[in-house]
A protein has these predicted regions:
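Negatively charged
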Residues: 1-370
């Protein structure tokens, strides 16, 4: 036999491929490297893709010495039957855990005690890990910069991670997208360095926790942040949204949302399309909003069934698209007669299925094509 201590970055992946070709769990006495559970991997630094798409692997590798490993990117992605206890692993040198358990659909191994203090990337880590629900609240995530899609479609995860130090995180895109069970208090998170929160709670059907203390002053995109977050209904009025340029679909299908957002600074927003579409309960005073930079308002209040606030003072002079803006807005009959719509090119179905009955004969619609 080749001495297992000779496994290095150069031989590690070849050894895995060879032994799993003989036995799906690496329990093969005649392997030149010995049984997989006995391997000495102490010299290996890169374990990225190690068991990627190894759909039959469920070997016991709990005794591996992983103290030299820095990269575990995609290590168990699509390892669809893997479910072992890895809590004894030394991951203190690992910096990259991107997609580590993505699509590892039955994995719920104990990893609660991992020292993750060196990790900077956890994006996609538990994406579609539909069985994972371990208590990882004590993890040190203070160095992590990317948590994008970390728990996306992780359908049963609902652990207390409210004490995490997220002060280094810049990217939270889709972090809880489709995390249908998650409803934990994360109000104390430091989000001051996060620049994008788009899709963050999209489809997080049970999430309804206070977020008013979050510092979102660096966020430029809130696109679809609470889309399909059916029960979310919190006061967000304290948010500093002055850096944001994108709010498309932020409350689309957030059916219970009626939180106070009257003081939001939307002066840099360019896209408000579908912003309150099917936000059935929304009826807050947003009359003072500075909409002077908005160019897209199509479907903004589409099917916003109870909205009927005074938005007559809005500056819509830069808006190009207003199609279906109030379509199905069952209560809206606000006075918007003074709006400057001279830049609008599309107004199709703007007031369809709404009771709107104001005299807008003075509108300049010379640019409207549809």
């Amino acid at each position: 036999f080749v001495n297992a201590s000779q496994l290095t970055d150069a031989t590690f992946q070849t050894a895995i491929n060879d032994i799993l070709a003989q036995d799906p769990n690496g329990d093969y006495d005649l392997s030149p490297y010995g049984k997989i559970q006995d391997w000495d991997v102490s010299q290996v630094t890169n374990m990225s893709n190690a068991f990627f798409n190894k759909s039959s692997f469920n070997g016991d590798i709990s005794a591996w010495d992983t103290s030299s490993v820095t990269n575990m990117n995609t290590m168990f992605r699509d390892a669809s039957v893997f479910n072992q206890n890895l809590n004894s692993w030394d991951v203190s040198s690992v910096t990259n855990m991107f997609s580590m358990f993505r699509d590892a659909s039955v994995f719920n191994g104990d990893i609660t005690s991992w020292n993750t203090g060196s990790v900077t990337g956890m994006g996609d880590m538990f994406y579609d890990a539909n069985s994972f629900n371990q208590d990882i609240g004590s993890w040190d995530v203070s160095s992590v910069t990317k948590m994008n899609q970390m728990f996306r479609s992780s359908s049963i995860f609902n652990q207390d991670i409210g004490s995490w130090d997220t002060s280094s995180v810049t990217n939270m895109v889709g972090m809880f997208y489709g995390a249908g069970s998650f409803n934990q208090d994360i109000s104390s998170w430091d989000t001051s360095n996060v620049f994008t929160m788009q899709y963050m709670f999209l489809g997080a059907n049970l999430f309804n926790q206070p977020l008013d203390s979050w510092d979102v002053s660096s966020v430029f995109s809130f696109e679809s942040m609470f889309q399909d977050a059916n029960v979310f209904n919190q006061d967000l009025n304290s948010w500093n949204t002055s850096s944001a340029t994108q709010m498309k679909s932020i409350f689309y299908k957030a059916r219970d949302f009626n939180g106070n957002i009257s003081s939001w600074d939307v002066s840099n927003i360019t896209d408000m399309s579908k912003m309150f579409r099917q936000a059935f309960d929304f009826n807050q005073d947003i009359s003072s909003w500075d909409t002077s930079n908005v160019t897209r308002m199509y479907e903004t209040f589409y099917d916003a069934r109870v909205f009927n606030q005074d938005i007559g003072s809005w500056d819509v002079s830069g808006v190009n698209f207003m199609q279906s803006m109030f379509n199905g807005a069952n209560d809206f009959d606000g006075d918007i007669t003074s709006w400057d719509v001279s830049s609008v090119t599309s107004m199709a179905f703007m007031f369809q299925f709404s009771p709107f009955n104001q005299d807008i004969s003075g509108w300049d619609v010379s640019s409207v094509g549809t």
